[in-house]
Amino acid sequence: MTNPIYLILADFFDRYIGEPPEKIHPVVFIGKLICFFENVFKSTNSVNKTRDLLFGFLNVILVLAIVFFMTYEIEQIINSISNSYIKISIYSIILSFSIGHKSLIEFSKAPIKFIVNNDLEGAKKSVQCIVSRNTSELDKKHILSASIESASENITDSIIAPLIYAAIFGLPGAFLYRAVNTFDAMIGYKSEKYQYYGKTAAYLDDILNFIPSRIAGMLLIISAPFYGGNIKSAIYGYFNEGNKTPSPNSGYTMATLANSLNMELEKIGYYKLGKGEITIEKALNSLKAVDYSVLLFLIIYTVLLM
C-alpha cells in the first residue's frame, strides 16, 4: 500500500496550487494518445460493429500499456532517490496531476457565482463547460442542479477513485484510472460514431468506478454533519435512489448529497433525486461536501495504515 503522506500531499498540492500547464499535463498527453490511435484505427465516421469493437479495444489496450510503462518507470526512478524529502516531494507532485480537486471546485462554483450576480446567461454558458446537456433553456433551479450533479459525480472521478487506485497500486494505478476516465469522457458516450468503438472504454470505466463511487457515497454520509447535511437522509438517498440514474455509479454520490441537503437534483427526462428547494447555501454546502469527504478518506486511510 502507498504511504499516506503521498496521497495527503498530492491532494494538498492539487487543491491549493492546482494543475500544471496543458503542455506538460499527463492527462492532456493521455488525451493526445487516445486521439492519435483513434486517427489510426478510425479514420472515417462510418460505423462497422466488428471493426469498431476490435479497434476500440486495441486503442484502449495500447494507451493503457504506454501509460503503465511510463508511470511504472517513473515510480522506479523516484523510489531510487535516497533523499526521502526529495522523493516524497517529487512523488506527491506527480501524483497530484492525477487529481482534479481544485478544478472540480472552481468549475462547479462558477455557475453559482453567476446566479448570485443574477446573470442567468453567464450561468448557462458556465455550466455548459461541465455537463453534456443542452443548457440554453435551463432555469436557475436546473443550472444549480447541473452544477451540483457535476460536483457530486466528480467526487468519484476526479478525486476519490484516483486516490484509491494510487493507494493500492501507486502512480501506475492512479494514472491508469485517469486514462480510462479520459477514454470514457472522449469516446465512451453513446453517439452513432462511438456506439461500438467506445464500448470497451465505457465498460471499463463503469467497472473501475463501481467500488470507488460507493465508497464516495459512504464518505458523504459520514461527513454529512460537517457540510450541513443530515446523515439519516443521506443514508436514505444512498440506498433508495443511488440506482436511479442511467449510470450504474454516479447516482450514489448524487442521490446521497441531494437527500443529505434536502434538495431535488433533476436532469430533465432522465432522473429526479431527493426533494426540496435548491438554494445558493445548499449549492455552496455541496462544494464543502467535496472537501470534507476527501479529508475523511485521507484520515481513514492514514489510520488504517498506522
Swiss-Prot record:
Which topology term describes how it sits in the membrane?
Answer: Multi-pass membrane protein
Which keywords are on file for this protein?
A: Cell membrane, Cobalamin biosynthesis, Membrane, Transmembrane, Transmembrane helix
Name one cellular component (GO) term: plasma membrane
Q: Which residues cross the membrane?
A: 54-74, 88-108, 155-175, 215-235, 286-306
Instruction: State the source organism's domain of life.
Output: Archaea
Q: Which GO terms describe its molecular function?
A: ABC-type vitamin B12 transporter activity; threonine-phosphate decarboxylase activity
Q: Which Pfam families match?
A: CobD_Cbib (PF03186)
Q: What does this protein do?
A: Converts cobyric acid to cobinamide by the addition of aminopropanol on the F carboxylic group.
Family label:
Belongs to the CobD/CbiB family.
Q: What is this protein called?
A: Probable cobalamin biosynthesis protein CobD
